[in-house]
Structure formats: C-alpha cells, structure tokens
Amino acid sequence: MPGKELPDRCMNCHEAEPAFLLRERHVCQECYIRFLNFKPFRRMERYRLRRNMPQTGPCKLLLPLSYGVSSTVLLHMLHRQLEALRSKKHGPAGFEILVLVVEPSTISPVPPHEEGFALAQQTFPLCSFTRLPFHSIFELDPDVHQIMSQYAGEHFTDDTSLSDEERLNRFRRSITTATSKSDVDQILLNKLVVAFAKKMECRGIVWGDSDSKLAAKTLANVAKGRGSAVTWQVCDGMSPFGLEFNFPLRDVFTAEIRTYATLFPELAGIIVHDEPPSENTLTKNLSIDELMIRYVSTQGEKYPGVMLNVTRTASKLQSSGTSIGGLQCNFCGAFMTTNENITGEQGNEQLQFCYACARSQPELSC
C-alpha cells in the first residue's frame, strides 16, 4: 500500500508549510506556537478580565521559577500576555507577575545559576524578580522552627546559635528515607513560596507544572497517603493557605513544552535541564516521587493522552465535607479528619500532623 502523503500546507492556517506534528495535525511553526500559548491564555482569562474580583488595584500573581523547562516556558507565555495587555490603551487591568527563584544551590549540590537569573530579568522586563535562599523560610515563616523541632522528635535539637542555613541543613539530615526527604523538602519549599506570596499580598500562585508533572504528583500523593491534598496540589482553585493555585500548563504535554522552548533561543541560557535518571540507581534508593516521575516520563512518551487523563480525572475530585473549616496539619497545611490527627509530642495538643506527614517523621518513617 502506498504511504500516506504529507500535506504541503499547514492544516490550521492553510498557508505556510507544516513543520510540526501537533496532536495528529501537521502545522506550521506559527500555528504551533499559537496553539500552545492559547492553553495558558484560556486559564488566565479570569485574571486578565478580573472576573469576580476588584477591577481596580493590583492583581499580583506569584510564579515560582525553578529554571526548569516548564516554569521557564510558562514565564515566557505569560510575559507575552503581559505585552499584549500593556499594548492596549483601554484594555482590561489584567494582572502582575512576580517571579520567585529559590536558589537551587541552597537546595541541592548544584552550582549557582547567576547568569540564568540575570538573563531572565533581561528577557522578561515586565515581571519583577526576587531570589531567595532555601533557609529564608525562617524569616518568612516565624513558626517554622517550632514546627520542625516537634516534627523531628526528641532526638533532634534546634540549635538557634547556628546560622539559618546550618539549622535547616541539620533538620533535613535528620530525615532518614529517600521518600521522606523528598516529601519534606517539597513541603518546606511550598511553605516558603506560600509565605512569600502572602508577604507580597499576591492573590494566587501560578505553578509551571506540565501534564506529566501533575500526573506524577497525583500518583505519588496517593501512594504517600496524601490523596486528600490532590484537590489543591494538582487542581485550579483555592488552597488551604488562602491563596488561589493555578496550573496553566496542565493541558500541555511535556514533549510539546520542550519543543516550544527550542523555538526561542533566548530561553536556552535560562533553562537548566534535568539530568537523565541513572540506570544504575537501585529502585529502593529512589523516592516515591522519583519513581512516579520516571514512570510517567517513560509511559507519557508512549501514551501522552493517558497521562493527561490522570490530571483531568483528579481535577474532578472535590474536597470532602469534613475538610471545610476543619483542622489543618501544622506541617503541610492539608485539612485533616479527626481520625488522622496525630499530635507532635506525647500529650501536646498544640501541633497536629496528618497521617502522611507522620509517616515521614524520623521516628516513624521506615
């Protein structure tokens, strides 16, 4: 049988030559870029038009930038929206984008990305940028030292004479297993981002998670006992912290994001690509988060629609009625049922930890 002939014109605009295969349609570069930009544009519409919110005054949104391809591409897309908003004299008030970079070298042993931060400021002048070390969580969240001390248990002592960086590193070293370490780091990063957003009086946070990251996060949360947190960790809407969480790239495949990034050379100096997982790493030495990311990455290339359906199914979930106005875990912030309320110390009712956080405690993790 003769092979299927490729179209000589873009299947969208019918003018330019096709350059990409986009969801079974051969499209040109301009249509490819337009299609992907429309995804976050649609999800940012309510902020652009100020629907159900004040029409005057600032509407600040925080974008955490990790220098990864997804968060960098999201920043590029939202900056294009800001350019379009500013070009209209009588257009809607729109929104502001505040970019927060938690310096990667203070989280893991990687070199500082000084040139990337400077290049991001130069490339996206309509956004304001802030860079903070991981240990600045002590300044932004005054209660975190008490929470960490009780969370780590009686064998851990928080030495306040040490620098904030040393105090945080000692606490992180007290966590034993790979899954617990990854889980605790994500909670601390989330607390830092939320605390900074509140300090800057932001209305919400826009996260640069792609469909694969959201699918992996959904599966990992369920495996770690954080299924109740899926409703706000991967879904658009109000979080337990009083801030709106938004995931504008939730309908975009990771492979599409990578291709998009290659079309804009100015992004190359900002993006720090993840190292491919080592084949020699034993499964038992990987965290649940790493296992799920590895699984979704390999299967997502074969079946991208399946991974997208995972996040779409999760977005249909609703918080249980017991979470409304109920107790919140002092560590991760998730709502708890009375059955899973676990106190931080014997007989101490001041701090409560949810079941999932209790599993990651040094004395209980296994």
UniProtKB/Swiss-Prot annotation:
GO terms for cellular component: cytosol. The keyword Cytoplasm applies. GO terms for molecular function: nucleotidyltransferase activity; sulfurtransferase activity; tRNA binding. The lineage of its organism: Eukaryota, Fungi, Dikarya, Ascomycota, Pezizomycotina. HAMAP family: CTU2 (MF_03054). GO terms for biological process: protein urmylation; tRNA thio-modification; tRNA wobble position uridine thiolation; tRNA wobble uridine modification. Plays a central role in 2-thiolation of mcm(5)S(2)U at tRNA wobble positions of tRNA(Lys), tRNA(Glu) and tRNA(Gln). May act by forming a heterodimer with ncs6 that ligates sulfur from thiocarboxylated urm1 onto the uridine of tRNAs at wobble position. Prior mcm(5) tRNA modification by the elongator complex is required for 2-thiolation. May also be involved in protein urmylation. It holds the Pfam family CTU2. It comes from Aspergillus niger (strain ATCC MYA-4892 / CBS 513.88 / FGSC A1513). It is found in: Cytoplasm. InterPro entries: CTU2 (IPR019407), Rossmann-like_a/b/a_fold (IPR014729). The gene is ncs2. Pathway: tRNA modification; 5-methoxycarbonylmethyl-2-thiouridine-tRNA biosynthesis. Belongs to the CTU2/NCS2 family. This is Cytoplasmic tRNA 2-thiolation protein 2. Keywords: Cytoplasm, tRNA processing.
